[in-house]
């Protein structure tokens, strides 16, 4: 089985280690590569997949929207998310899906039943994929650009707020989807008033524990790192390609170990 992740740049990707571990554990012979592709190389890659050279692709930045033109169809998750992170074959056709949102929701299930209020921080592609996958519409969007928050909220029939009006004590689950925190110093919002046992998730996994998660933990929250979404979406992709449900616990330990090195 020949699998790969396509992006640019891609050297930082931990997907090969994760998926090759799952291939070995499942008794499947195969490989998973990281392909640093320029835009002009994309047509040949998808042509090769049609010809049987590849069994599946993950797609990452900056190609999640671009690859749509090379596919035969998108499933509902990809259509709603407006982006593709996984390509698989069915009856010779190339199908695009998006497992980011569903992967995160699945990873959060041990912590919440989603019966309370959910706050989504950010209004970009990641936020869109997560909102469409949530099993609730009791959702509030907050974003630095209010117009984008309103547009996303209107798309999914949820509400939006501003950082000035927001009260974090209202929410049972907070999901941070922006890049704020990658610098290991910044935090996207104030957690003043955060209730104990609130579930706080940051989809960033470098650093493993962001400044926001550090503060949330100090306030008694249940924190979930970006590894949860990374492994969750990867598991759903792996299952699409192989029909095998991989061990996410083992995958999570592997990735956390690599990030802590």
Curated annotation (Swiss-Prot):
Pfam families: SDH_C (PF18317), Shikimate_DH (PF01488), Shikimate_dh_N (PF08501). Keywords: Amino-acid biosynthesis, Aromatic amino acid biosynthesis, NADP, Oxidoreductase. It catalyses: shikimate + NADP(+) = 3-dehydroshikimate + NADPH + H(+). Pathway: Metabolic intermediate biosynthesis; chorismate biosynthesis; chorismate from D-erythrose 4-phosphate and phosphoenolpyruvate: step 4/7. One of its GO terms (biological process) is chorismate biosynthetic process. It comes from the Bacteria. Shikimate binds at residues 13-15, 60, 85, 100, 205. NADP(+) binds at residues 76, 122-126, 143-148, 203, 226. One of its GO terms (molecular function) is NADP binding. GO terms for cellular component: cytosol. Its EC number is 1.1.1.25. It is an enzyme of class 1 (oxidoreductase). The keyword Oxidoreductase applies. Disulfide bonds: none annotated. The keyword Cell inner membrane does not apply. Transmembrane segments: none annotated. The active site is at residue 64. Belongs to the shikimate dehydrogenase family. HAMAP family: Shikimate_DH_AroE. Involved in the biosynthesis of the chorismate, which leads to the biosynthesis of aromatic amino acids. Catalyzes the reversible NADPH linked reduction of 3-dehydroshikimate (DHSA) to yield shikimate (SA). Homodimer. This is Shikimate dehydrogenase (NADP(+)). It comes from Exiguobacterium sp. (strain ATCC BAA-1283 / AT1b).
């Amino acid at each position: 089985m020949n699998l790969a992740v396509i992006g640019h740049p891609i050297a930082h990707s931990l997907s090969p280690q994760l998926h090759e571990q799952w291939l070995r554990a499942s008794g499947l012979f195969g490989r998973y590569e990281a392909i640093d592709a320029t835009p002009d190389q994309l047509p040949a890659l998808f042509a090769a997949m049609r010809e049987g050279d590849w069994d599946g692709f993950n797609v990452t930045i900056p190609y999640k929207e671009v690859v749509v033109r090379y596919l035969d169809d998108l499933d509902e998750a990809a259509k709603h998310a407006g982006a593709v992170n996984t390509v698989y074959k069915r009856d010779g056709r190339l199908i695009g899906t998006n497992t980011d949102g569903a992967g995160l929701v699945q990873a959060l299930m041990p912590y919440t039943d989603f019966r309370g209020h959910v706050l989504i921080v950010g209004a970009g592609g990641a936020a869109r994929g997560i909102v469409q996958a949530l099993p609730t519409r009791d959702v509030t969007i907050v974003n630095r650009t209010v117009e984008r928050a309103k547009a996303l909220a209107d798309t999914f029939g949820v509400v939006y707020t501003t950082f000035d009006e927001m009260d974090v004590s209202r929410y049972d689950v907070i999901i941070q989807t922006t890049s704020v925190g990658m610098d290991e110093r910044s935090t996207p919002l104030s957690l003043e008033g955060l209730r104990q046992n609130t579930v706080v998730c940051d989809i960033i996994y470098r650093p493993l524990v962001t400044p926001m998660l550090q503060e949330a933990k100090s306030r008694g929250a249940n924190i979930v790192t970006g590894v949860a979404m990374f492994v969750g979406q990867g598991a759903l992709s792996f299952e699409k390609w192989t029909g095998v449900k991989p061990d996410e616990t083992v995958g999570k330990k592997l990735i956390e170990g690599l990030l802590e090195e």
